[in-house]
Amino acid sequence: ERPRRTKAYPIALINKNINLDQLLAINNAMKYPLAYIQGPPGTGKTNTIINTIVTAFFNNVTVLFASYNNVPIDNVFEKLSSMKYRGKTIPFPVLRLGNTEKVMEAIKYINELRTQVQSLQIFASTLDKRKDDRIDRAKRLSARLKEYEEILDLKERKETLTHLMKYQEHMKNTMKLLPFQTDLQGYQMQKLDKRIAAIGEISDADAMQLLDRNEDEFYQYLFYTSARYIKALEEPKFQELRQILDSDETPEKLVNEFNKYMRKSENV
Protein backbone atom coordinates (compact mmCIF):
# COMPACT_ATOMS: atom_id res chain seq x y z
CA GLU A 1 0.00 0.00 0.00
CA ARG A 2 1.23 3.48 -0.85
CA PRO A 3 2.35 5.66 2.08
CA ARG A 4 -0.29 8.24 2.86
CA ARG A 5 -1.02 10.97 5.37
CA THR A 6 -4.22 10.54 7.39
CA LYS A 7 -4.53 14.18 8.44
CA ALA A 8 -7.43 16.23 7.04
CA TYR A 9 -5.86 19.04 5.03
CA PRO A 10 -7.76 22.29 4.44
CA ILE A 11 -8.27 22.83 0.71
CA ALA A 12 -7.49 26.39 -0.33
CA LEU A 13 -8.67 27.60 -3.74
CA ILE A 14 -7.90 30.80 -5.64
CA ASN A 15 -11.08 30.36 -7.69
CA LYS A 16 -14.27 28.32 -7.71
CA ASN A 17 -13.84 26.87 -11.23
CA ILE A 18 -13.64 23.37 -9.84
CA ASN A 19 -15.67 20.18 -9.51
CA LEU A 20 -15.74 17.15 -7.22
CA ASP A 21 -13.24 15.13 -9.26
CA GLN A 22 -10.74 18.00 -9.15
CA LEU A 23 -11.30 18.48 -5.41
CA LEU A 24 -10.66 14.78 -4.92
CA ALA A 25 -7.43 15.07 -6.94
CA ILE A 26 -6.26 17.96 -4.72
CA ASN A 27 -7.23 16.09 -1.56
CA ASN A 28 -5.35 12.96 -2.66
CA ALA A 29 -2.32 15.01 -3.71
CA MET A 30 -2.08 16.24 -0.13
CA LYS A 31 -2.34 12.71 1.28
CA TYR A 32 0.31 11.05 -0.88
CA PRO A 33 3.96 12.07 -1.47
CA LEU A 34 3.50 11.86 -5.25
CA ALA A 35 0.56 12.90 -7.44
CA TYR A 36 0.11 12.46 -11.20
CA ILE A 37 -2.52 14.67 -12.81
CA GLN A 38 -3.59 13.74 -16.32
CA GLY A 39 -6.53 14.23 -18.65
CA PRO A 40 -7.50 15.46 -22.12
CA PRO A 41 -7.34 19.17 -23.04
CA GLY A 42 -9.98 21.35 -21.46
CA THR A 43 -10.55 19.21 -18.36
CA GLY A 44 -9.05 21.74 -15.93
CA LYS A 45 -5.63 20.17 -15.33
CA THR A 46 -3.79 23.50 -15.05
CA ASN A 47 -6.39 24.93 -12.69
CA THR A 48 -6.25 21.76 -10.57
CA ILE A 49 -2.44 21.96 -10.38
CA ILE A 50 -2.52 25.64 -9.41
CA ASN A 51 -5.06 25.01 -6.65
CA THR A 52 -3.08 21.98 -5.47
CA ILE A 53 0.06 24.12 -5.11
CA VAL A 54 -1.87 26.88 -3.30
CA THR A 55 -3.40 24.25 -0.98
CA ALA A 56 0.07 22.83 -0.29
CA PHE A 57 1.34 26.34 0.50
CA PHE A 58 -1.57 26.88 2.88
CA ASN A 59 -0.61 23.63 4.65
CA ASN A 60 3.15 24.42 4.79
CA VAL A 61 4.01 21.69 2.28
CA THR A 62 6.75 22.19 -0.32
CA VAL A 63 5.93 21.09 -3.87
CA LEU A 64 8.11 20.14 -6.83
CA PHE A 65 6.01 20.42 -10.00
CA ALA A 66 7.44 18.73 -13.10
CA SER A 67 6.12 18.08 -16.60
CA TYR A 68 7.33 16.45 -19.82
CA ASN A 69 7.09 19.84 -21.58
CA ASN A 70 7.55 23.47 -20.63
CA VAL A 71 4.10 24.83 -21.47
CA PRO A 72 2.19 23.73 -18.33
CA ILE A 73 5.13 24.70 -16.11
CA ASP A 74 5.27 28.18 -17.64
CA ASN A 75 1.48 28.57 -17.41
CA VAL A 76 1.38 27.56 -13.74
CA PHE A 77 4.30 29.82 -12.84
CA GLU A 78 2.76 32.76 -14.72
CA LYS A 79 -0.51 32.36 -12.86
CA LEU A 80 1.02 31.93 -9.40
CA SER A 81 3.48 34.80 -9.81
CA SER A 82 0.84 37.24 -11.08
CA MET A 83 -1.86 36.79 -8.40
CA LYS A 84 -3.02 40.10 -6.97
CA TYR A 85 -4.54 41.35 -3.75
CA ARG A 86 -6.24 44.76 -4.05
CA GLY A 87 -4.11 45.70 -7.05
CA LYS A 88 -0.81 44.56 -5.52
CA THR A 89 1.07 41.52 -6.79
CA ILE A 90 1.18 38.73 -4.21
CA PRO A 91 4.87 37.84 -3.53
CA PHE A 92 4.08 34.13 -3.81
CA PRO A 93 7.21 32.02 -3.09
CA VAL A 94 7.37 30.05 -6.34
CA LEU A 95 10.40 29.52 -8.59
CA ARG A 96 10.57 28.49 -12.24
CA LEU A 97 13.80 26.50 -12.52
CA GLY A 98 15.43 24.92 -15.56
CA ASN A 99 18.39 25.88 -17.74
CA THR A 100 20.93 28.61 -16.94
CA GLU A 101 18.66 31.35 -18.26
CA LYS A 102 15.71 30.19 -16.15
CA VAL A 103 17.82 29.95 -12.99
CA MET A 104 19.15 33.48 -13.54
CA GLU A 105 15.56 34.69 -13.93
CA ALA A 106 14.68 32.87 -10.69
CA ILE A 107 17.49 34.60 -8.81
CA LYS A 108 16.36 37.97 -10.16
CA TYR A 109 12.77 37.15 -9.19
CA ILE A 110 13.74 36.31 -5.59
CA ASN A 111 15.57 39.61 -5.24
CA GLU A 112 12.58 41.50 -6.63
CA LEU A 113 10.37 39.85 -4.01
CA ARG A 114 12.86 40.69 -1.26
CA THR A 115 12.69 44.35 -2.27
CA GLN A 116 8.89 44.28 -2.54
CA VAL A 117 8.30 43.03 1.03
CA GLN A 118 11.08 44.97 2.74
CA SER A 119 8.84 47.62 4.30
CA LEU A 120 5.75 45.49 4.90
CA GLN A 121 4.43 45.00 8.42
CA ILE A 122 3.04 41.52 9.12
CA PHE A 123 0.93 40.42 12.09
CA ALA A 124 1.47 36.66 12.31
CA SER A 125 -1.15 36.06 15.01
CA THR A 126 -3.92 37.36 12.74
CA LEU A 127 -2.79 35.12 9.89
CA ASP A 128 -2.64 32.07 12.15
CA LYS A 129 -6.16 32.74 13.49
CA ARG A 130 -7.58 32.91 9.96
CA LYS A 131 -5.91 29.59 9.21
CA ASP A 132 -7.36 27.96 12.35
CA ASP A 133 -10.87 28.96 11.25
CA ARG A 134 -10.64 26.48 8.35
CA ILE A 135 -9.70 23.33 10.29
CA ASP A 136 -13.20 22.11 11.20
CA ARG A 137 -14.49 22.79 7.69
CA ALA A 138 -11.50 20.87 6.31
CA LYS A 139 -12.34 17.78 8.35
CA ARG A 140 -15.93 17.76 7.12
CA LEU A 141 -14.87 18.26 3.50
CA SER A 142 -12.27 15.50 3.81
CA ALA A 143 -14.94 13.11 5.12
CA ARG A 144 -17.28 14.05 2.26
CA LEU A 145 -14.55 13.51 -0.34
CA LYS A 146 -13.79 10.13 1.21
CA GLU A 147 -17.44 9.19 0.74
CA TYR A 148 -17.35 10.46 -2.85
CA GLU A 149 -14.27 8.33 -3.52
CA GLU A 150 -16.13 5.34 -2.07
CA ILE A 151 -19.15 6.08 -4.29
CA LEU A 152 -16.90 6.05 -7.38
CA ASP A 153 -15.43 2.70 -6.30
CA LEU A 154 -18.85 1.20 -5.56
CA LYS A 155 -20.26 2.30 -8.92
CA GLU A 156 -17.24 0.88 -10.72
CA ARG A 157 -17.67 -2.45 -8.93
CA LYS A 158 -21.39 -2.44 -9.72
CA GLU A 159 -20.68 -1.81 -13.40
CA THR A 160 -18.17 -4.68 -13.47
CA LEU A 161 -20.63 -7.02 -11.76
CA THR A 162 -23.41 -5.97 -14.16
CA HIS A 163 -21.22 -6.75 -17.19
CA LEU A 164 -20.31 -10.12 -15.68
CA MET A 165 -23.95 -11.03 -15.07
CA LYS A 166 -24.93 -9.97 -18.59
CA TYR A 167 -22.11 -12.03 -20.04
CA GLN A 168 -23.16 -15.07 -18.04
CA GLU A 169 -26.77 -14.59 -19.11
CA HIS A 170 -25.63 -14.43 -22.74
CA MET A 171 -23.50 -17.56 -22.32
CA LYS A 172 -25.93 -19.55 -20.16
CA ASN A 173 -26.47 -22.12 -22.90
CA THR A 174 -22.77 -22.91 -23.21
CA MET A 175 -21.66 -22.66 -19.59
CA LYS A 176 -23.18 -24.03 -16.43
CA LEU A 177 -23.41 -21.86 -13.32
CA LEU A 178 -24.00 -23.35 -9.91
CA PRO A 179 -27.09 -21.88 -8.15
CA PHE A 180 -25.01 -20.45 -5.30
CA GLN A 181 -22.94 -18.42 -7.81
CA THR A 182 -26.04 -16.69 -9.15
CA ASP A 183 -27.31 -16.09 -5.60
CA LEU A 184 -23.94 -14.69 -4.54
CA GLN A 185 -23.86 -12.23 -7.43
CA GLY A 186 -27.39 -11.10 -6.63
CA TYR A 187 -26.42 -10.62 -2.98
CA GLN A 188 -23.33 -8.63 -3.96
CA MET A 189 -25.43 -6.37 -6.20
CA GLN A 190 -27.92 -5.74 -3.37
CA LYS A 191 -25.09 -4.94 -0.98
CA LEU A 192 -23.57 -2.45 -3.43
CA ASP A 193 -26.93 -0.76 -4.03
CA LYS A 194 -27.58 -0.54 -0.29
CA ARG A 195 -24.25 1.14 0.43
CA ILE A 196 -24.63 3.57 -2.49
CA ALA A 197 -28.09 4.53 -1.20
CA ALA A 198 -26.76 4.93 2.35
CA ILE A 199 -24.12 7.44 1.27
CA GLY A 200 -26.46 9.24 -1.13
CA GLU A 201 -25.61 11.42 -4.08
CA ILE A 202 -22.83 13.95 -3.59
CA SER A 203 -22.88 17.02 -5.81
CA ASP A 204 -20.33 19.73 -6.59
CA ALA A 205 -22.56 22.13 -4.62
CA ASP A 206 -22.32 19.92 -1.50
CA ALA A 207 -18.54 20.18 -1.52
CA MET A 208 -18.49 23.89 -2.35
CA GLN A 209 -20.59 24.59 0.75
CA LEU A 210 -17.65 23.39 2.86
CA LEU A 211 -15.11 25.65 1.14
CA ASP A 212 -14.17 29.12 2.31
CA ARG A 213 -15.95 31.59 0.05
CA ASN A 214 -14.36 34.78 1.37
CA GLU A 215 -12.06 35.34 -1.60
CA ASP A 216 -10.82 38.79 -0.53
CA GLU A 217 -9.81 37.51 2.90
CA PHE A 218 -8.03 34.50 1.41
CA TYR A 219 -6.06 36.67 -1.03
CA GLN A 220 -5.12 38.86 1.93
CA TYR A 221 -3.87 35.73 3.71
CA LEU A 222 -1.86 34.72 0.62
CA PHE A 223 -0.36 38.20 0.31
CA TYR A 224 0.86 38.56 3.89
CA THR A 225 1.83 34.92 4.44
CA SER A 226 3.86 34.97 1.22
CA ALA A 227 5.51 38.19 2.37
CA ARG A 228 6.32 36.60 5.74
CA TYR A 229 8.15 33.73 4.01
CA ILE A 230 10.09 36.11 1.75
CA LYS A 231 11.05 38.35 4.69
CA ALA A 232 12.35 35.24 6.48
CA LEU A 233 15.13 35.05 3.87
CA GLU A 234 16.84 37.88 5.77
CA GLU A 235 17.24 35.67 8.86
CA PRO A 236 20.71 34.34 9.80
CA LYS A 237 19.90 30.76 8.73
CA PHE A 238 19.63 31.92 5.10
CA GLN A 239 23.00 33.68 5.05
CA GLU A 240 24.45 31.24 2.49
CA LEU A 241 21.52 31.83 0.13
CA ARG A 242 21.76 35.62 0.51
CA GLN A 243 25.45 35.52 -0.35
CA ILE A 244 24.53 33.80 -3.61
CA LEU A 245 21.62 36.15 -4.33
CA ASP A 246 23.74 39.26 -3.69
CA SER A 247 26.84 38.00 -5.51
CA ASP A 248 28.42 39.81 -8.47
CA GLU A 249 29.81 36.58 -9.93
CA THR A 250 29.39 35.60 -13.58
CA PRO A 251 26.02 34.04 -14.48
CA GLU A 252 27.62 30.61 -14.95
CA LYS A 253 29.21 30.61 -11.49
CA LEU A 254 26.13 32.14 -9.89
CA VAL A 255 23.87 29.47 -11.38
CA ASN A 256 26.29 26.74 -10.33
CA GLU A 257 26.32 27.98 -6.71
CA PHE A 258 22.54 28.37 -6.65
CA ASN A 259 21.96 24.87 -8.04
CA LYS A 260 24.41 23.43 -5.52
CA TYR A 261 22.50 25.15 -2.72
CA MET A 262 19.14 23.87 -3.99
CA ARG A 263 20.37 20.28 -4.22
CA LYS A 264 20.48 20.06 -0.43
CA SER A 265 17.13 18.76 0.80
CA GLU A 266 17.27 20.92 3.92
CA ASN A 267 17.29 24.04 1.72
CA VAL A 268 13.99 23.39 -0.07
What does each model-found stretch correspond to?
Residues 27, 50-51, 74:
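The feature captures the helix immediately C-terminal to the Walker
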Residues 65:
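Conserved SAM-binding loop
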Residues 43-45, 69-72:
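Gly/Ser/Thr-rich loops at beta-strand to alpha-helix junctions
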Residues 53, 57, 81:
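Gly/Ala-rich phosphate-binding loop of Rossmann-like dinucleotide-binding domains
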Residues 1-31, 103-122, 127, 255-258:
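Pre-P-loop entry segment of helicase/translocase ATPase cores
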Residues 1-17, 151, 168-268:
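Conserved helicase NTPase catalytic core signature
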Residues 62, 70-174, 178, 183-218, ...:
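P-loop NTPase motor core
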Residues 32-52:
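Walker A/P-loop
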